[in-house]
């Protein structure tokens, strides 16, 4: 399974730097100097390899320089490029309470009594922590669930579900 670890949002400056929207939990490793990235170009099935020359944070954004991308027009041509990795290449986690996003997406969401409430559609990473986005089985609306042990006490990737113990009001329609 191919996983997106970053997306080129736009160019930055005139020397070919790229603003990359990070979609990985470890950008320091993924975008380290010398790392070879596979990039899926927009509106194309072509995948190219790019070597990271440098990466730095600037105003809360990741700026990346790639070998051979030396000016603004070359950087602009990469706008929308998705940097991808194969999930089979990811190392297994040493922590049983740590999961890759793709392992959680698609899991059934149950309450503590076992009733199916919905499906995890996405894992969102925010400054305040991770959130599970759930599509409610009842009406299809999106519900954001803080991914903390107090609210999500059980995760069973092997059995295909998470159990939530929602605080009052979390599941209520607005």
Curated annotation (Swiss-Prot):
Lineage: superkingdom: Bacteria
Ranges where the PRC barrel domain occurs: 96-170
Extent of the signal sequence: none
Locations listed in the record: Cytoplasm
Keywords: Chaperone, Cytoplasm, Ribosome biogenesis, rRNA processing
Chief location of this protein within or outside the cell: cytoplasm
GO cellular component, one term: ribosome
SUPFAM superfamilies from the UniProt entry: PRC-barrel domain, Translation proteins
Subunit-structure text: Binds ribosomal protein uS19.
Family in the record: Belongs to the RimM family.
Name of the protein this chain belongs to: Ribosome maturation factor RimM
């Amino acid at each position: 399974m191919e996983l997106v670890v970053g997306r080129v949002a736009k160019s930055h400056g005139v020397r070919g730097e790229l603003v990359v929207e990070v979609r990985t939990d470890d950008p320091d490793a993924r975008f380290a100097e010398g790392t070879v990235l596979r990039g899926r170009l927009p509106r194309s099935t072509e995948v190219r390899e790019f070597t990271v020359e440098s990466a730095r944070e600037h105003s809360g954004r990741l700026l990346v320089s790639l070998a051979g991308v030396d000016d603004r027009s070359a950087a602009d041509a990469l706008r929308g490029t998705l940097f991808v990795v194969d999930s089979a290449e990811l190392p297994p986690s040493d922590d049983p309470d740590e999961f890759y996003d793709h392992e959680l997406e698609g899991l059934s969401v149950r309450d503590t009594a076992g009733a199916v409430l919905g499906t995890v559609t996405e894992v969102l990473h925010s400054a305040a922590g991770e959130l599970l986005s759930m599509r409610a089985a009842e009406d299809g609306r999106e519900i954001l669930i803080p991914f903390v042990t107090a609210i999500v006490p059980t995760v069973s990737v092997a059995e295909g579900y998470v159990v939530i113990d929602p605080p009052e009001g979390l599941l209520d329609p607005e």
